[in-house]
Amino acid sequence: MFRKNSLSIFDAANFFLKIVDRDAGSTITPLKLQKILYYAQGYYLAYYDKELFSEDFEAWAHGPANEAIYNKYKKYGFDSIPCPTDETINISDNICAFLSDIWQTFGIYDGKFLEEQTHKEEPWIKARKGCAIGERCHNIITKESMKDFFKTVINDV
């Protein structure tokens, strides 16, 4: 079992939604947000041996997704999610720095590119086992499989 942070997936989502430089033309769609959150969780598990947030990702047809995040932002479809105005961010400086690094690394890509990347990675592939291509799948991508995979990624760098 992993040690817990008090952060929720919505705290992390709000951080990413606020960090987007919309004036410079940057955008964040629901698809991109899902993948950025997935990578944040994966790398956090690998670096710190604890979860960034407790919520899980499922192995959906378009890559890792969290159903609560999907339900909150699905109304935006393929459009960019606007900056939240009423959400305050109460995240430690260390976690802010970590999330900023994740954004610097993955925020330059669009959601479709990130989706394609996750489709090549073991945690999603393993969780999709038994599900047909395009089939709705609610199999959990385990934090253990994410940690193991992302540890190999950081060790290869």
What residues fall within each predicted segment?
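Domain-edge interaction signal
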Residues: 1-157
